[in-house]
């Protein structure tokens, strides 16, 4: 298995592709199926042979200035300097993933191993995966979308020398909660539009129902609730939680005391302003 984060493995893309292309051509086969010939365009002339100039003429008729998917499948004869895309000339996902420390990579394996197969883009109403995707039809709210956002978030943290694993361990071992003042200031800055990619990740994670259908049905077992909880742990060490979270979190401690004064509690709950606040918080 090739690890595209390893430059020595990435360098094997060209020789392996050349060998496979030669082997399939030798036996009258193709290097691609219904899709996938675009990034393998350098092999198109070898497979089409004498028909390749006809493809170039067709390309020139509809795209004389080589503006539509340049470098893919065929170059127009009207642009003689145009070249086909080289199989080792495109950016690989591993080029970006190298910014993620290996320890962090292993720790967030339920997110980073998403291979983009798209099984979560499921329209079948009887299939459990994924309810938030089915409800929104927004790919950001799919397991694939959330895994991609987390991987990019980890990459950006790595670029700034932030070790998210160490940060999580520190929070748990020291219970070192950020001061309410700092949390409030950060949250105000967020409301005022201060840029932080974490907010985009948060919006995607907030729509997850934590049903774990992805963990059971995704072919590579992407587990959104698992890495979602870890992200939220760090996110809310920097930004305030919604008020409703604090209210619900306090119920376990306040209900035993409220149970001693049921009439007063019921009266307060029936007051118009209180009901309005509870309905809208």
Outline where the language-model segments fall.
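Conserved glycine-rich FAD pyrophosphate-binding loop
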Residues: 1-115, 139, 145, 167-170, ...
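Short, well-ordered loop/turn and helix-capping segments at boundaries between secondary-structure elements
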Residues: 4, 22, 26, 46-50, ...
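Alpha-helical scaffold segments in soluble metabolic enzymes
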Residues: 19-22, 53, 57, 149-152, ...
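Mobile "lid/hinge" segments at catalytic clefts and subdomain interfaces of large enzymes
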Residues: 21, 55, 65, 120-171, ...
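Proline-centered turn/helix-capping motifs that create local helix->coil transitions or kinks
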Residues: 24, 28, 66-67, 122-125, ...
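Iron-sulfur cluster-binding cysteine motifs and their immediate structural context
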Residues: 70-72, 113-149, 207, 211-232
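Iron-sulfur-cluster electron-transfer modules
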Residues: 169-171, 180-281
